Every structure is written in C-alpha cells, then in structure tokens.
C-alpha cells in the first residue's frame, strides 16, 4: 500500500502537475484511474470554471456551478463530483495500477467525495497520488 500527496504554492499548479504526471504514466503504459482538474478562466467572472477529466480517457465533467456574481459560498457541485467518483471507481475496478485524485478537500475530509475510493484503492494495493492545498 502506497499513498503520496503533492501540493504547490501557486493556484492551479497542482492541477497542471497531476495532469502531466497522468499523461507521462499513461504514455509509459501504466494503467491509471482517477481525475485531474482543468480550470478555465471566465471573462464574466473572477472565478474559473472547474472541470475534471476522468482518467484514463474521459469524460470531462463540470464540477463547479455558477452561484451568481456576488456569491461567496462553495461552488462545487456535489452531484457532479459524485458522478466523477463513480466513473473513476469503474476504471479502478478494471485493474488500475495508480489512482490519481486532483484534490483531497472538504468533501473528502467530511467522508464524501473520493474518500471511499482512495480507501478502496489502498485495499487493492493500488498506488494513490492526491493533490492537496497548502
């Protein structure tokens, strides 16, 4: 059982790093599963759209929701996140060697999100790489 985490100091850098790691591993023939995050800047907002690409080969799922210009709350769409979890679990059960998760955040800390998938991967002796915030 092996679990590792990574974090960077600049916004979006962890997402880019994990995406690059996923691409390199896949290019080397390693069976990967999980998600990497894609942030897309919006002209009409100071906040970006957040999507995740389900590994190894899609789909891309929008995990952020627009709450309006003045909204200050969490923009994560929990239903979209759970859809990504289900898709990632399917790939895990097809014999993945490495699970990559874009972020261990509030949902995981609260027992939701990718938490159970991380535990399942560890029980299956699948290596886990997780992005975290500073």
Predicted segment positions?
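Helix-adjacent hinge/juxtasegments
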Residues: 55-94
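Structural motif
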Residues: 97-98
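Short amphipathic alpha-helical segments and helix-helix/interface helices
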Residues: 18, 22, 115-122
């Amino acid at each position: 059982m092996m679990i590792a985490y990574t974090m960077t100091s600049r916004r979006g850098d962890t997402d880019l790093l994990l995406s690059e790691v996923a691409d390199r591993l896949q290019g080397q023939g390693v069976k990967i599963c999980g998600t990497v995050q894609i942030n897309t800047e919006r002209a009409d907002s100071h906040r970006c759209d957040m999507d995740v690409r389900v590994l190894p080969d899609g789909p891309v799922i929008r995990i952020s929701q627009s709450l309006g210009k003045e909204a200050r709350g969490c923009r994560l769409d929990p239903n979209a996140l759970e859809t990504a979890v289900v898709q990632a679990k399917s790939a895990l059960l097809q014999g993945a060697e490495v699970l990559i998760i874009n972020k261990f955040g509030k949902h995981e800390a609260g027992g939701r999100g990718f938490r159970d998938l991380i535990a399942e991967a560890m029980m299956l002796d699948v290596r886990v790489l997780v992005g975290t915030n500073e």
